[in-house]
Curated annotation (Swiss-Prot):
GO MF term list: DNA binding; DNA-directed RNA polymerase activity; magnesium ion binding; zinc ion binding
List of residues binding Zn(2+) 2: C831, C905, C912, C915
Cofactor: Mg(2+); Zn(2+)
Protein name listed in UniProt: DNA-directed RNA polymerase subunit beta'
Subunit structure: The RNAP catalytic core consists of 2 alpha, 1 beta, 1 beta' and 1 omega subunit. When a sigma factor is associated with the core the holoenzyme is formed, which can initiate transcription.
Domain of life: Bacteria
Cofactor note: Binds 1 Mg(2+) ion per subunit. Binds 2 Zn(2+) ions per subunit.
UniProt-annotated binding residues for Zn(2+) 1: C72, C74, C87, C90
SMART domains for the chain: RPOLA_N (SM00663)
Length: 1438
């Protein structure tokens, strides 16, 4: 064998092993020895004088290989010709030094040692298998107690027989030995009479070796099924899980519990724990060497002590120290007393080198540094084409060096590589010629960190430029999120022909015009370009003071207009007419006379004809739509050329227009002083009301905030109007704002109006951001006073602090999203599911937020969509909804469409193309191999960072609009009001009105002619209603009004008030207002939890008519004994003043939703439809009883401090909250089912992004939520092998149940010898067996039908879902590395390398796109090679 190995050339020595799965398991002592190259006997590393490795030490050359290439330790054999020879003097094999990176040694331990992972981490594997608690296990392992392994005939001091697993002190152990017969210790260990007790890991090894897993599994299953106590049942199930893991793992490979105890410790290769000489004769060493040294020193000392037969006490102490040193070698963080260096830093153990960002997985396997790369500062390249970038010459010469060298040799300019390098380094002119040729058709990749989505790396065709900076095309800046204030970019060079092809066809910048997150163009002109285009297409008319040349001229063609412009006969912004091609009603391109401006004529010269004549002012939003439209009607090259043209045009006209602004362009409205004076007067009026005690302090505060908010809004409107009308809208500031080039309404407001209300500094991040009620009245043009400036600084600094903190959060969110959805790949065309998701327009407060068309565009419909009026089929089942179909559906009365969705896709691996629908980056149907999971994660995560960075744009100014306090009819129509109960009462002005006292009043507004539902609203409890059921209303009529600042409780009856449990100082406090001296009674949470503050209403005959429970914080408006009329407000409950919302609230909200966390004070939700009644109070909770029509009763406990939203005798539906607070996703899943919770999550997350103006397509969230819901929890395992409460993949669950379908379970095997009770057989086998028994008159087999398992769907957070993927490699590289690996090893898991991450880690191509496994056998070649093969095929007929 040895000779053979020497003769083969180097390449065959390590052939690339092809593998398609990886399994993991516990290493047996034999397998460690088989891998090892020798035993490390000495703790020495290298000799301090010769600096050579010590023999048999931790760096020994005989074990690990030579330190120098092809040179043995003593120097007898040098050079490559002796390769493979083992030196007879020093025993070192002559080979390359790199073998020191992969040769492993070992240490033979004198006593077995328990592996820390299996007794210190939870769940405690050894403890669960033996059924011992962790504390007791530690007592055994660290040599504190003896444990009985086999009791034999032993008895304790009282003469009782002892049991297995009894713990004995040393004294008890010795006493028992004294009482035993002398020959007992000479019996065989497995003789039932022998008494065996041991301590330490060898005792555990013995116990584990004696365990019969099958029997233990049977016992535990029996226990789990028949145990009455909940605790013992869960205990049995937990143990069963570990036992089943071992049993399962033995199917694939041998995996024995006693291997959790080690007899041999492997020593990792020395190059992976190097010893580096520093200057000054000292050495820097890896921590692992210290840890190994401690193990070897203690092991050798123990060996010596045993040889000299030292006393037991000393041995035991040494064994315990050895156990501790092996513990810290494997995992130094788990121990209370970690081994530390002199500088008090814990040493890095083997586990630490796997964990975390600096660990093996994330540092070296998932992210590697690459060759052929460069980086430099970027500058703008306005004359580049969209697919080009400028690369400095020197950088290119270095990057393309090998290609240049090859050409130099080919041309015969040089003979050797070395001389070619010299020529390149000298930068001789011939090099540049060759370089120009080499880079043709050889693109490079540009990457800007942070790469948040796939547009962060794009391919460009390089152009050689002078200088040292990379030139970047201005239109791709948006995608890279780059600007030119010193950003740097990295350059990478694709080397192989396949890589070059992929870069050119898939990654070229001109192919990435659309954003994968929402399908809108991402290469959109911004800033100067938009401003220039806006300016050139804006219309200006002649006024007295300003005459526009050439107004209303008529031109025959664009050429004519051009001539007139150049000759100065017509101005750019003049209104003119022109004969040009545009679409008519039928959608055909024809010549017509169009009224337009000279600038627009110029612009339309570069617009492709297929797009018609664009006659609009170009704002950023318009441009985005135009680019999208042009891409849809033409192709990528046309669009790319168009983009380049408008880029040049934009810059040209921004320069020609000279658009900049001065202080004079910022116009402050004259009415400002008057507005502020009015607002101040109103505030004073409110303070007066407050001083007289008419309103509470909270109401006063809320109203003041409202007044200033609306004053500010009015002022902003005035300022905008001013600036809009200045110079016909040619005010530079207004143009920048209106075109979308820079600035926002908010910023204009702060420059010209007033800065407005500011948020109060928070003490903690969790605290509320209240609003300071005195606004900043100055604006930046006038300048701020010292106090105003001081208040402002808080907001500005908060913005910067938030940015720094939140970027990390957003990055972590992206990482979790990637991990959970990385293995979702489009694997098949159609999964054939019959399920879908019903989509309708998304409304908020009756405003349509997202129309039906927008939501279904690019989806595949599940069933035919039919127009309800005409019964025409608008789109057939299985068709994609294109823009054209979308318009048809929008114009029809269809309100709901059922579409395919990733949420319901039934593909076994990944997802199918039909359920996913359109690929947003191309606008066509998704192809197989598309990594949609990663794209979803990027699309959701990328704006996360943007959002976090967006808080500071308006330095802490409190946004918010005045609270709404009424409902107006949005359309004319007929009202239908359901569940309306009212009483007569007085409103704030003392007029008689109807007051609503029902909680679930709903109004529907119906079109009188068609009967179509136009709008629905809930009418709030306590509001004054001005209409009746079936009344016809006009648009704008007031339907109802309410107090926006307070929730109220209104009396339904006339009568007399009595207080119950209302004791001052206990259940309510009297708050005396310092300024007014007015007293208010406010309900507070007292110490006495039994008190339930209640108002009782008594009728005429002193009978109790009604009682009202009062929530904490309610203000009482009536006194004890007061006589009241129906409709009287009894209690006001102040609504919490509006907090300032920024995405700081947004990012944690998204995290909360995606992690499926339950909110801190969740609402109590009804699980059934029924009628409400109130029960007793238990431990500070009020009991709410709901009884359904069918007599089912459910009881709920609601905290007294939370507000109850239902009243006695209300009818509630399942899923309706009974108390205030957020509804938990778990409740929705439990009560309304998986579809409801999926919709809830999608809509809630979208809501957060929508507030920030970020558009993300629903399907990305659906992909992630699909991954969160891929598990079910077993409720009843039936006859399957599942365990109760076990989490399993839905697919596996269905497969197992399907296997059992139609089978039988033997209950009584009768006289059959083949079947046992509990066995699962087919009906056929049962029939055959029984017919055999019948013939011989024996007892027949009795069997019953199989009981299949039942399970409920589970919603897991993205972190949990990532850690529970099928792939242990992916999970380990995510979080909790040691825990994942230790569970995988026990279960002997197999990773089939199906996701992207695990393939990156093992160095395979990812199974997506061109790396899909079915293309593995495809050979890529040239056309000629193919033709040659074809000819051969015909000739030889194969």
């Amino acid at each position: 064998m040895m000779e053979n190995r020497n003769n083969n050339n180097n390449r065959d020595k390590n052939p690339v092993k092809r593998f398609n799965k990886i399994s993991i398991g516990l290493a047996s002592p034999e397998s460690i020895l088989a891998e090892s190259r020798g035993e490390v006997l000495k703790p020495e590393t290298i000799n301090y004088r010769t600096h050579k490795p010590e023999r048999d030490g931790l760096f020994c050359e005989r074990i690990f290989g030579p330190v120098k290439d092809f040179e043995c330790a003593c120097g007898k054999y040098k050079r490559i010709r002796y390769k493979g020879i083992v030196c007879d003097r020093c025993g070192v094999e002559v080979t390359e030094k790199k073998v020191r990176r992969d040769r492993v040694g070992h240490i033979n331990l004198v006593v077995p040692i328990a592996h820390i992972w299996y007794f210190r981490s939870l769940p405690n594997k050894i403890g669960y298998i033996l059924g011992l608690p962790s504390k007791k296990l530690d007592m055994i392992i660290y040599y504190e107690r003896y444990v009985v392994i086999q009791a034999g005939i032993a008895q304790n001091a009282e003469g009782e027989s002892i049991k297995r697993l009894d713990f004995l002190t040393e004294e008890e152990y010795l006493n028992i030995l004294d009482t035993l017969p002398a020959d007992n210790q000479y019996l065989d260990d497995f003789d039932p009479n022998k008494f065996v007790a041991k301590m330490g890991a060898e005792c555990i090894m013995d116990l584990l070796a004696r365990i019969n897993l099958d029997e233990l599994s049977y016992d535990l299953r029996h226990k789990a099924n028949n145990e009455t106590s909940k605790q013992r049942k869960t205990e049995a199930l937990k143990r069963l899980q570990v036992v089943e893991s071992f049993r399962e793992s033995n199917k694939n490979r041998e995996n024995r519990p006693e291997w959790m105890i080690m007899k041999v410790v492997p020593v990792i290769p020395p190059e992976l724990r190097p010893l580096v000489p520093l200057d000054g004769g000292r050495f820097a060493t890896s921590d692992l060497n210290d840890l190994y040294r401690r193990v070897i020193i203690r092991n050798n000392r123990l060996k010596r002590l045993m040889e000299i037969k030292a006393p037991e006490v000393i041995l035991r102490n040494e064994k315990r120290m050895l156990q501790e040193s092996v513990d810290s070698l494997f995992d130094n963080t788990r121990k209370a007393s970690a081994v530390k260096t002199e500088s008090n830093r814990p040493l890095k153990s083997l586990s630490d080198s796997l964990k975390g960002k600096q660990g093996r997985f994330r540092q070296n396997l998932l992210g590697k540094r690459v060759d052929y790369s460069a980086r430099s500062v970027i500058v703008v390249g306005p004359e580049l084409r969209l697919f080009e970038c400028g690369i400095p010459k020197d950088m290119a010469a270095e990057l393309y060096k090998p290609f240049v060298i090859r050409k130099l040799i080919e041309r015969g300019i040089v003979k050797t590589v070395k001389s070619a390098k010299k020529i390149i380094d000298k930068k001789e002119p011939v090099v540049w010629d060759i370089l120009e040729n080499v880079i043709k058709g050889h693109p490079i990749l540009l990457n800007r960190a942070p790469t948040l989505h796939r547009l962060g790396i794009q391919a460009f065709q390089p152009k050689l430029i002078e200088g040292k900076a990379i030139q970047l095309h201005p239109l791709v800046c948006t995608a890279f999120n780059a600007d030119f204030d010193g950003d740097q970019m990295a350059v990478h060079l694709p080397l192989g022909p396949e890589a070059i092809l992929e870069a050119q066809l898939l990654m070229l910048a001109s192919h990435n015009i659309l954003n994968p997150a929402n399908g809108a163009p991402v290469t959109v002109p911004s800033q100067d370009m938009v401003l220039g285009l806006y300016y050139m297409t804006k219309e200006r008319l002649t006024t007295e003071g300003h005459i526009i040349l050439g107004q209303d001229l008529v031109f025959y063609s664009a050429e004519e207009t051009n001539i007139a412009l150049n000759e100065g006969r017509v101005e750019l912004n003049a209104r003119v007419k022109i004969r040009a091609k545009d679409f008519n009603e039928e959608g055909e391109l024809v010549y017509k006379i169009i009224q337009t401006t000279a600038g627009r004529v110029l612009f339309n010269e570069v617009v492709p004809e297929a797009a018609g004549y664009i006659n609009d002012v170009l704002t950023k939003k318009n441009l985005r739509d135009i680019i999208g439209k042009i891409l849809a009607v033409t192709d990528v090259p046309t669009t790319a050329a168009f983009l380049d043209n408008i880029k040049d045009m934009g810059y040209k006209f921004a320069f020609k227009g000279g658009l900049s602004f001065s202080l004079g362009d910022i116009r402050i409205p004259e009415q400002k002083t008057q507005l502020i004076a009015d607002a101040r007067a109103q505030v004073e009026g409110i303070s007066g009301n407050y001083n007289m005690g008419l309103i509470t302090n909270n109401e006063r505060y809320n109203q003041v905030i409202d007044i200033w908010t609306s004053a500010n809004a009015q002022l902003t409107e005035l300022a905008m109007k001013n600036i809009r009308e200045d110079q016909q809208g040619f005010n530079s500031v207004y143009m920048m704002l209106d075109s979308g080039a820079r600035g926002s309404k908010e910023q204009i407001r702060q420059l010209t109006g007033m800065r407005g209300l500011m948020a109060k500094p928070k003490k903690s991040t969790a605290g509320g951001g209240e609003i300071i009620e005195n606004p900043i009245l100055s604006n930046f043009k006038e300048g701020l006073s010292i106090l105003e400036y001081f208040i402002s600084t808080h907001g500005a600094r908060k913005g910067l602090a938030d940015t720094a903190l939140k970027t990390a959060d957003a990055g972590y969110l992206t990482r979790r999203l990637h991990d959970v959805s990385q293995d979702v790949i489009v694997n098949i065309e159609d999964c054939g599911t019959l399920r879908g998701v019903e989509v309708s327009a998304l409304k908020k407060n009756e405003e349509i937020v997202e129309s039906l068309g927008e939501r279904i565009l690019g989806r595949v419909v599940l069933q035919d969509v039919v127009n309800p009026l005409t019964n025409d089929i608008l789109v057939h089942a299985g068709e994609q909804i294109t823009e054209a179909i979308m318009k048809v559906i929008e114009n029809s009365p269809v309100e709901k469409v059922e579409v395919r969705s990733p949420l319901v896709c039934e593909a076994t691996k990944g997802i199918c193309a039909k359920c996913y629908g359109r690929n947003l980056a191309t606008g066509k149907m998704t192809q197989r191999g598309e990594a949609v999971g990663v794209i979803a994660a990027q699309s959701i995560g990328e704006p996360g960072t943007q959002l976090t960075l967006r808080t500071f744009h308006v330095g802490g100014v409190a946004g918010g609009i005045s609270e709404e306090s009424n409902i107006l009819a949005k359309f004319a129509g007929r009202l239908e009001i359901e569940d309306l109960k009212t009483v007569k009462g007085e409103d704030g002005e003392g007029n008689l009105v109807d007051i609503v006292i029902s909680r679930s009043t709903e109004m529907k507004l119906i079109d009188q002619k068609t009967g179509i539902l136009l709008a629905t609203n809930n009418i709030p409890y306590g509001s004054s209603i001005y209409v009746n059921d079936a009344q016809v209303v006009e648009k704008g009529d007031v339907i109802c009004k309410w107090d926006p600042y307070n929730g109220v409780i209104v009396s339904e009856f006339t009568g007399k008030i009595a207080y119950e449990d209302l004791e001052q100082g206990q259940s309510f406090m009297v708050e005396i207002d310092e300024q007014t001296g007015f007293q208010e009674k406010v309900i507070s949470e007292g110490r006495n939890k039994k008190l339930i503050p209640t108002l009782l209403v008594y009728g005429k005959n002193d009978e109790l008519i009604r009682s009202y429970n009062l929530p904490v914080g309610a203000h009482l408006m009536v006194n004890d004994g007061e006589k009241i009329k129906a409709g009287k407000i009894l209690v006001k409950i102040p609504r919490r003043s509006s907090k300032t919302g920024d995405i700081t609230g947004g990012l944690p909200r998204i995290t909360e939703l995606l992690e499926a966390r339950n909110p801190s004070n969740p609402a109590v939700v009804s699980e059934i439809d029924g009628v409400v009644s109130f029960g007793k109070i238990k431990r500070g909770n009020r009991e709410i009883v709901i009884e359904s029509k069918f007599g089912e009763i459910k009881k709920y406990l609601v905290k007294l401090s939370s507000q109850i939203l239902v009243q006695e005798n209300d009818f509630v539906r399942a899923g309706v909250p009974l108390s205030d607070g957020a509804i938990t996703p778990d409740d929705i899943l439990r009560i309304q089912g998986p579809a409801a919770v999926q919709q809830y999550l999608v809509n809630e997350i979208q809501e957060v992004y929508r507030l920030q103006g970020v558009k993300i397509n629903d399907k990305h969230f659906e992909v992630v939520i699909r991954q969160m819901m891929r598990k079910v929890r077993v409720q009843d395992p039936g006859d399957t092998l599942f365990l109760e409460d076990q989490l399993i993949h839905t697919k596996d669950f269905i497969v197992e149940n399907d296997k059992l379908y139609g089978m039988k379970v033997v209950e009584d095997s009768g006289d059959s010898s083949n079947l046992k009770a509990g066995q699962i057989i087919t009906p056929r086998e049962l029939r055959d067996e029984n017919s055999l028994l019948k013939r011989t008159d024996k007892n027949l087999v009795i069997a019953r039908d199989v009981i299949t398992a039942t399970a409920t769907p589970v919603l897991q957070g993205i972190t949990r879902a990532s850690l529970q993927t099928k792939s242990f490699i992916s999970a380990a590289s995510f979080q909790e590395t040691t825990k994942v690996l230790n569970e995988a090893a026990v279960a002997g898991k197999i990773d089939y390398l199906e996701g992207l991450k695990e393939n990156v880690i093992v160095g395979h191509r990812i199974p997506a796109g061109t790396g899909m496994r079915e293309y593995d056998h495809t050979i890529v070649g040239s056309k000629e090679e193919y033709n040659d093969l074809m000819v051969a095929k015909e000739e030889f007929n194969y």
